[in-house]
């Protein structure tokens, strides 16, 4: 056992590796960074926001070697007791985080056609990490596993049965690690009993989703088989009538691939505003009177409020609504507009508390009294992954979850 063990958390995306190093005893972040632009001449590694290091034409293993070298420079290599990997999609095979074995890798590969862009990158990260740290126990944490508690009526689509039975077409949901972390923290902040409570978690960022959590379990969520379904997002359309897309294809001659690009990359806040997918840009334009920016934000808010209210139907009661993610944590305007839309649920906003910056951390923003408590809880997916790794790796756990 290392005297000062740490957990290395790795998140391999389609062209990047985000990583952090957390102290096992406290889960404090000791080091964090990103290797971006994999397999291009512009690839780089940035540690703790410092000057980027050139990694031209590096693949995942090259980038992880560079990260390992930076660990060694900081005398952290021998302290790596566990490695936690974020895996985008676990399909129906993975209902919880697991110790990585050859069999687990084979099963991840089996479900990877459900998320080819991300899962194969995740597998590349696992292969590289196992090669570089052969003696270190590694854990896989799935973005979909928290939602495996959905009932069939919540995850099935109204399609012919064979698409589900033969192809696995169903709602899987995403942002599960974030929803799980935030709901756990909400029980403490709101003084709720995990075994008898109802929460709605709104993870709002460039990607966004809603999750209904009943008695500690996900019972409904807005994203579907892919992250496209549900809320309108930065560049994703969210819910859209398939008939409308078929009509567009007929009228314009666009292919399925063309339309898939449109709804994933050219829609959402960007599509309606014609300006940007960045909410900060749109909020500035809102205050300057830019009509399409205002319309994009109002549509974004309407969809969020509608999904929150709809997801409440999956709960036995509604104790709290929690905002998280880059937008949920930082946008005073979006929280205000969403809560104003949800007056039907008995929500009342504390305007001054809502204006508090995210540096204030976890905070209740609903007025007293309010039928439903509204709060902001910064997400921490890296910590959740580290906690799972610590638990499964049987390393001395932190004193408390917080």
UniProtKB/Swiss-Prot annotation:
Please tell me where Mg(2+) binds in this chain.
11, 381
Q: Where is this site: Transition state stabilizer?
A: 175, 236
Check the record and name the Pfam families matching this protein. Answer: Acetate_kinase (PF00871)
Q: Which keywords, in A-to-Z order, does the entry hold? A: ATP-binding, Kinase, Magnesium, Metal-binding, Nucleotide-binding, Transferase
Q: Which domain of life is it from?
A: Bacteria
What is stated as this protein's family in its record? Belongs to the acetokinase family. TdcD subfamily.
Instruction: Give residues annotated as binding substrate.
Output: 86
What's the cofactor? Mg(2+)
Tell me its EC number(s), please: 2.7.2.15
- Show the GO cellular component annotation of the record: cytosol
Residues binding ATP, per UniProt: 11, 18, 175, 203-207, 278-280, 326-330
The gene name on file is tdcD
Which InterPro entries does the entry link to? Ac/propionate_kinase, Aliphatic_acid_kin_short-chain, Aliphatic_acid_kinase_CS, ATPase_NBD, Propionate_kinase
Name the species this protein comes from.
Salmonella typhimurium (strain LT2 / SGSC1412 / ATCC 700720)
GO MF term list = acetate kinase activity; ATP binding; metal ion binding; propionate kinase activity
What is its quaternary makeup?
Answer: Homodimer.
**What is the annotated role of this protein in its UniProt record?**
Catalyzes the conversion of propionyl phosphate and ADP to propionate and ATP. It can also use acetyl phosphate as phosphate group acceptor.
Q: Which SUPFAM superfamilies match?
A: Actin-like ATPase domain
What's this protein's name?
A: Propionate kinase
Name the active site residues: 143 (proton donor/acceptor)
Q: Top enzyme class of this protein?
A: transferase
Q: Name one GO biological process term.
A: acetate metabolic process
Protein's pathway: Amino-acid degradation; L-threonine degradation via propanoate pathway; propanoate from L-threonine: step 4/4
Q: What chemistry does it catalyse, as a reaction equation?
A: propanoate + ATP = propanoyl phosphate + ADP
